[in-house]
Amino acid sequence: YENYASFALEERMAKTPDAVYKLLDQIWTPTLSKAKEELADINAEIKKDGKTFTAEGWDWRYYADRAKKAKFDLDENQVRPYLKLENVRNGVFYVANKLYGITFTQLDNLPLPHPDAQAFECKDKDGSHLGVLYMDFFPRASKKGGAWCGSYRSQTYKDGKKVAPVVTVVCNFTKPAAGQPALLSADEANTLFHEFGHALHNLFKDVHYYGVASVPRDFVELPSQIDEHWAFEPE
C-alpha cells in the first residue's frame, strides 16, 4: 500500500483516497460559495446593531437565525405549533411502516429508565418480533446533553438463535408545562428522524459478530441521513 489511507479505505465505501478527494473537490466550491453568502447576511445583521466586528464561530447561530427571519420571514417559533412531539414521533413510525412494512406498538409492562420514557415493540411486516425501541425525549439531571441512538442489548446470536435488539433513542427536547404539548423546532424534528434512522439500522441488523454499527465506518451515518430526507416530504 502506498500509504495508510489506501490500506484503511480498501474495505470501506470510498475504496481509495482518490475517491475521497474527488468527493471533497465536488462539494468544496459550492459549499464555500454558500458559506460566504451566509456570512455576508450575518455581517449585515451585525451592522444593523451598529457593531463593527466580523462574525466569529460563536456569533453564527444567533445572527444566522436573525438573517433567516429577515431574508425569508422565517421565525422558528412559528413553526413549532405544527410539530407536536407526539405527531413527529407518529410520523417517523408512519414513514417506517410505509417504507418497510414494520409496526410499533407501545408496551406498558417493561421497566423504564424514567417515567417520561416510553417503550415500543417493533414487528416486521410478517408479524415477527424485530426488537424493542425505547424513546427518552426530555432532559434531566442524570442525562448528558444532545441526541443519540444506543442499545441496551445489541442484536446477536446465542446458541445458534437470533437475539433481538433493545434499542434506545435519546434526545433533550424542552419538556412542556403540565397539560401542554411538547413542540419541536424544524431542526429538532429533523434530529428525531436522524436518530430514528440509526434505530432502524440497529433493529434491522442481522449479524453474528459485535461491532459499533457492524458496517464500514463511512456507512455509519447513511441510514440516519437517509431517514432525515423524509422529515419534510409532503406525502
Regions found by a protein language model. Name each.
Residues 1-175, 229-235:
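Active-site-proximal, well-structured secondary-structure segments within enzyme catalytic domains
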Residues 2, 197-210:
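Catalytic Zn2+-binding segment of zinc metalloproteases
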Residues 9-13, 178, 204-212:
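Short, flexible helix-adjacent loops and helix caps
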Residues 81, 85, 178-189, 212-216:
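Alpha-helix N-cap/helix-initiation motif
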Residues 96, 175, 180-203, 224:
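Active-site recognition of the HExxH zinc-binding catalytic motif
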Residues 110-114, 196, 216:
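A short beta-turn/loop motif at secondary-structure boundaries
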Residues 118, 167, 187-189, 222:
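Residue-level detector of short, conserved catalytic/binding motifs and their immediate flanks
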Residues 129, 205-235:
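Acidic/histidine-rich catalytic neighborhood
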